[in-house]
Swiss-Prot record:
This is Small ribosomal subunit protein uS2. One of its GO terms (biological process) is translation. The gene is rpsB. Coiled coil: none annotated. One of its GO terms (cellular component) is cytosolic small ribosomal subunit. GO terms for molecular function: structural constituent of ribosome.
Length: 251
């Protein structure tokens, strides 16, 4: 789904931070200032936003995985909801250091989470003593909170999408170390350095956050449906040929 300039305005994407907190590296994306608040140039945001969405669309069309990241209070729910809609992994609680660079260890925690979930599903937890069951239940809650959003992520993601790159410096650094492309919302108080696909704009307003997250989720779904259409188109021809052949054999 395409996003219009009007929608960006209505969501307050153009409202940056107070001018005294600005990062000079964001100067190319700043239109001016109003009441000591920097105003983002939406014409430039629009171009960058579309570039980012094209990248996400292509990635999804190639069956790639994009990890959604934002642990900010006002972004958590929105981000998790849109990531789930797109069938993508997400981190909405706390970024655990080494989540990417030490994925081997994270994988062990994911394995444990699935084991505990299976215990609850098949009822084997009921065979434990009350005290043991309570310990396991608490462990499950802790694991679900920290890695529940990435439990189906089999390996490292092909890209990460971050709302507020300054707030998630560790995630950005880990992605850079591993050469994982970063799609990031960058406000006027942060540096766009090291962000492969910059979306210059407000990273605090929940309406703006929803616009970005929905856009990325839509791009993922569009990329995926494109693949399905291609498979159906290619498979459709094959299916017709096979069917004709089998009818001839029957006759």
């Amino acid at each position: 789904m395409t996003v219009t300039m009007r929608q960006m305005l209505e969501a307050g994407v153009h409202f940056g931070h107070q001018t005294r907190f600005w990062n000079p590296r964001m100067a190319p994306y700043i239109f001016g200032q109003r009441n000591k608040i920097h105003i983002v140039n939406l014409e430039k945001t629009m171009v960058k936003y579309n570039e980012a969405m094209n990248f996400v669309r292509k990635l999804a069309a190639n069956r790639g995985t994009i990890l959604f990241v934002s642990t900010k209070r006002q972004a958590r729910e929105i981000l998790a909801e849109e990531a789930r809609r797109a069938g993508m992994p997400y981190v909405d609680e706390r970024w655990l250091g080494g989540m990417l660079t030490n994925f081997k260890t994270v994988k062990q925690s994911i394995k444990r989470l699935k084991e505990v979930e299976a215990m609850i599903e098949d009822g084997s937890i009921e065979r434990l003593s009350k005290r043991e069951a309570l310990t396991v239940t608490r462990e499950l809650e802790k694991l679900q909170k920290s890695i529940g959003g990435i439990k189906d992520m089999g390996g490292l993601p092909d890209a990460i999408f971050i709302i507020d790159v300054g707030y998630h410096k560790i995630a950005v650094t880990e992605a850079q170390k591993l050469g994982i492309p970063v799609v990031g919302v960058v406000d006027t108080n942060h540096s766009p350095e090291g962000i492969d696909y910059i979306i210059p704009g407000n990273d605090d307003s929940s309406r703006a956050i929803r616009l970005y997250a929905r856009g990325v989720a839509d791009a993922v779904l569009e990329g995926r449906s494109q693949v399905l259409q291609e498979i159906v188109a290619a498979g459709g021809d094959e299916f017709v040929e096979v069917e004709e052949g089998s009818q001839e054999q029957q006759g």
